[in-house]
């Protein structure tokens, strides 16, 4: 079965599908729905909403942050981007779409942000499934931690 997964910057035509996203009960603990974070991301310079598409249908979402102020609490690398708010709508869980999207991410970032040499993210230490997804997608745990809303978060790094 072919998985035609691609990444695209948010476009207004994605909105109806993004507004209908639902999360699994487990995901509700650790991430936000696109409709909860999209309007804020669109209103702030250096935030880039990205949609995960399956055959041009939105199935996932995340935000890339380039703001030095936002990045400061995660990394001292001025050439890093922060990935946040990754979500996959519940009906598409378990199909490998999130992993495929994370495998596409380095090329996407390199193409649109040629100055970037690292992608960083924070994952809650209790979110084992997400941690495994990121590690299988090339992210590394270099031992850096921070405290988030639900406790300890691991700062993971993907060097480009």
From Swiss-Prot:
Residues 5-160 form the N-acetyltransferase domain. It comes from the Bacteria. It is an enzyme of class 2 (transferase). Keywords: Acyltransferase, Transferase. The keyword Chloroplast does not apply. InterPro entries: Acyl_CoA_acyltransferase, GNAT_dom. SUPFAM superfamilies: Acyl-CoA N-acyltransferases (Nat). GO terms for molecular function: acyltransferase activity, transferring groups other than amino-acyl groups. Its EC number is 2.3.1.-. This is Uncharacterized N-acetyltransferase YbbJ. It comes from Bacillus subtilis (strain 168).
């Amino acid at each position: 079965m072919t998985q035609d997964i691609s990444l695209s910057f948010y476009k207004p035509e994605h909105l109806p599908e993004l507004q209908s996203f639902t999360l699994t009960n487990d995901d509700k603990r650790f991430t936000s729905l696109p409709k909860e974070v999209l309007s804020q991301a669109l209103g702030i310079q250096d935030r880039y909403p990205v949609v995960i598409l399956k055959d041009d249908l939105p199935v996932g979402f995340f935000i890339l942050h380039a703001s030095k102020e936002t990045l400061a609490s995660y990394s001292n690398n001025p050439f890093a981007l922060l990935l946040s708010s990754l979500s996959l709508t519940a009906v598409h869980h378990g199909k490998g779409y999130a992993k495929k999207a994370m495998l596409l991410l380095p090329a996407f970032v390199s193409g649109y942000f040629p100055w970037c040499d690292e992608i960083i993210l924070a994952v809650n230490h209790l979110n084992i499934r997400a941690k495994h997804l990121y590690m299988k997608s090339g992210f590394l745990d270099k031992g850096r931690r921070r405290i988030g809303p639900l406790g300890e978060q691991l700062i993971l790094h993907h060097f480009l």
